[in-house]
Amino acid sequence: PAYMALSHAKALAQRAADGKPDHFHYVQMPLNLAMTEGLTSSTQEVGGKMYPAVRAATLLGLRVMASGAIRQAKLGTLPSHVNKALGEDLTSDAQRALQFTRSAPGVGTALVGLKQPTHVSEALALCTQAPMAPSAVLGMFGKPKT
């Protein structure tokens, strides 16, 4: 498969812990407006059912750190319906992209690298906005694909 089986990794961590609590608590995966598979593609088996990676991680007790939150600044221009869904009061596509990733249900941290002080200020301004409701994020895509 083209993905890591999270349940297998968790089972290996539990086996290595030899009956004690394992130390596998976090997983990092790409998640952004261009790479939504972590929310939309059911690639992970947990308990005999298929789930998207972020949901599977949550079911396995893992915290998700989403990398590439603003897609290394290669956003392009977001379509108007995406802008509307993410919040028309946000001032840039970078803020909208970060809003999407930080609001994704099951994501604990959205990782982003910023070089310019103005970009840092722009990202920090997002802290004055509430994250999107989980249903609003998931509603952007419809039902997860299997």
Predicted segment positions?
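Beta/alpha (TIM)-barrel catalytic core signal, keyed to glycine-rich beta->alpha loops juxtaposed to Asp/Glu
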Residues: 1-146
